[in-house]
Amino acid sequence: MKVNLRNRSVFGFVIPDMVKGPWADIASGIRQTAQRDGHGVCVPLCWDNPAAVLRHPSVFARLCAEAGIDGVFLRAFPDRKDTRRVLSALRREKIPVALLRVNDESPICGAGFDVVTLRSEGRVLSRVALRLGSVACHALLQRLAKPRNPPADLVLE
């Protein structure tokens, strides 16, 4: 069963600590902005169990493709190898990925991936996370809808 809606995109999240804390606020900001501005809908993928994605990244990517997911917002996993495996699996299925990170955590080098850096100082992150999510959504939904060659890093301050 496909989840695509007419003339709207469907985006997925894979964010390990999305249930609470600043990342939950960032995800909420992206979701609210996407729905409010008519870009599309955002759905959590493996909300409570990101380890399932790591166990079978190619199966996860295939399921995303079959479900009609148009793009994925991914927070880097603690182990860079795990992040690369998931990125590569999604790329094989031709699903655009936006890799989210705060400041300089988990730097990933990989041609063809959009890396979005959300700049913030310490505790400020939890207060401005919703706004950062909103700004990230505007920038990323445009880039996921119309990929540029080559993708470049986007820094939001």
Residue ranges and their predicted role:
Residues 2-116:
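Alpha-helical recognition/docking segments in bacterial nutrient-uptake
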